[in-house]
A protein has these predicted regions:
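Core catalytic alpha/beta fold that binds nucleotide/phospho-ligands
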Residues: 1-128
Length: 128
């Protein structure tokens, strides 16, 4: 296994707090599954801030940012049954990673955290 990309992002929660009041923003950035999942969260600002940071971190791990027809909604963050966050692999993301790194199989790892004022995310993409 080889690390292909690493990305990290930090965001002030107050920036997301102001933005999530705008439904256009939420619908442009977050998938319908993420929006549905948010309804179960007690801390909406933390929920959206951590996911925003995770999307930015993934784009940085790719090394391309949001280019090549990649947008925020393409990068979907879900949780397993124990609550651990993970990047949901879509066909589009799989194709982008395969093309960018010229690999067939890969894994994505995600760690997210928040504190009162900030949320952060760390992403790793590696070959299998």
């Amino acid at each position: 296994m080889k690390i292909l990309g690493i990305g990290v992002d930090i965001i002030q929660n107050k920036r997301i707090k102001a933005s999530i009041r705008n439904h256009k923003f939420k619908n442009r950035i977050f998938s319908s599954k993420e929006l549905k999942l948010s309804s179960y969260s007690k801390n909406k600002i933390g929920f959206f801030s951590k996911r925003f940071a995770a999307k930015e971190a993934f784009a940085k791990a790719l090394g391309t940012g949001f280019r090549n027809n990649l947008n925020f909604k393409d990068i979907e963050i879900m949780n397993d049954k124990l609550g651990k966050p993970y990047y949901a692999k879509s066909k589009k993301i799989t194709n982008i990673v395969r093309k960018e790194f010229r690999v067939k199989n890969f894994n994505c790892f995600l760690s997210i955290s928040d504190e009162k004022e900030y949320s952060t995310a760390f992403a790793i993409i590696e070959t299998v």
